[in-house]
Structure formats: C-alpha cells, structure tokens
Amino acid sequence: MYRCLAGILVQRRSGCDLVSYLTPRLFSKLGIKRPTWETDPLGNSFGAGGLFLTLSELHKFGLFYLNEGRWNGRQILSEQWIKESTKAADVDHYGYLFWRGEYNSYRADGKYCQISMVLPDK
C-alpha cells in the first residue's frame, strides 16, 4: 500500500501527474521520450507499478542505476538514493521497486517478463 501512496502524495504535492513531474527531472535526462503511467479511475498514478517503457528505455534505466545515478557525466539521483532503493527492505527481498537477487544483483521487472537486471560486481 505505501508504495502506491507515495505516487499519490507526489501528485498532490506537485499538482501534476507522475509523468509530468518526472519528465524534466529524470526521463528527459535519460532520453526517455514518451513514458506513460497507468492511472486509476480518479487519475492517480500507481507509483509502485504501471510505468510503460520500451525495452531500450528499461535498459537505460538499468544502466543509470549501475552507474549509481549518473548519466552522461551528470549526477541525476544521489548515490545514497540508489543504494537505499536497491537494498532489500523486507523479507521478500524487495526494495523500492527493485528485487534483490544473488551475487549482489537487483532487478526491475516489467510487464510480459521484461527485466532490467543489474550485477554491479560483474
């Protein structure tokens, strides 16, 4: 539930939907041109999922995380956020939208079995 609530709180605080909020701050910096986010009947983005990216855009996101929040030489997200969001927060090995795996790996799962897996130690 809290993962869904975070998206709604960002929308209410910013006054715009998650895509509009994140496009200038993140998506455009990564070259993600037209992200879409699924919404509920009230127009709230489901912050814990429902983000539609192409496979190449999902790959960019994985590279961005592998580079600890840096893209094209610029720090876009703090290294601390990357570390926090990719560590296992509960018993099922799930962090902030990332699943923890063996060998210090983590992954973001997309619809229809699309996966962006990051193995920082390899």
Q: What residue spans do the PLM features occupy?
A:
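A conserved catalytic-loop motif detector
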Residues: 57, 63, 71-87
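A structural signal for well-ordered alpha-helical scaffolds and beta->alpha junctions
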Residues: 2-3, 19, 55-58, 78, ...
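Active-site-proximal alpha-helical segments within enzyme catalytic domains
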Residues: 5-9, 47-70, 115-122
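Active-site helix/loop module of the DD-peptidase/beta-lactamase fold
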Residues: 14-49
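Active-site Gly/Thr loop motif
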Residues: 33-34, 79-122
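Alpha-helical scaffold elements that line and support the substrate/ligand-binding pocket
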Residues: 1-26, 58-64
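A generic secondary-structure signal for well-formed alpha-helical elements
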Residues: 13-14, 30, 65, 69, ...
